[in-house]
């Protein structure tokens, strides 16, 4: 959880809102809008604060071994992570213009904290292909970005349950 928190501090979501969404929406702190009656305003939020993110990564054991924030950090005493493992992710998304713009901003902000990111833009047919070979539904990624919406006022909580994890039992079409 602390690694995820550090990553959240390192994501410049305001730059995404300003540059890709033209400032038309606030930066979300959960997948439920702050204006929604079920939004929990007491939840911890993680504003863009790369210094706090890097400090937390150091505390956890993700060390900047070469004093170069542009190279990935390495594990040194991170719980359940072999020493020397790079803090690096593969980020997959579609080749749509907005997805490219978002990936550029987020990957650059992560790299600024010493988190390695390799971005892969797949064709929609490749990205949404059925599992186990497809990128999204085959769960062949570390980070993935795609758009989802709902047509009801009820938040789509069921999308994030265990039964929605794509696998052979649900024909690789779960939404979690």
PLM features: what roles do these ranges have?
Residues 4-5, 17-18, 55, 116-132, ...:
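Extracytoplasmic/peripheral linker and loop segments enriched in polar/acidic and small residues
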Residues 109, 142-145:
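Ligand-binding pocket segment of bilobal, Venus flytrap-like solute-binding proteins
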Residues 91, 145-146:
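Short beta-strand segments
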Residues 35, 72, 125-126, 151:
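Positions that flank functional sites
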Residues 1-108, 112:
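Append "and occasionally in soluble cytosolic enzymes with long acidic Gly/Pro-rich linkers
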Residues 96-97, 148-152:
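Short, glycine-/Ser/Thr-/acidic-enriched flexible segments
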Residues 39, 84-85, 141-142, 161-166:
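Aromatic-residue hotspot detector
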Residues 24-26, 137-140:
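A short, structural micro-pattern
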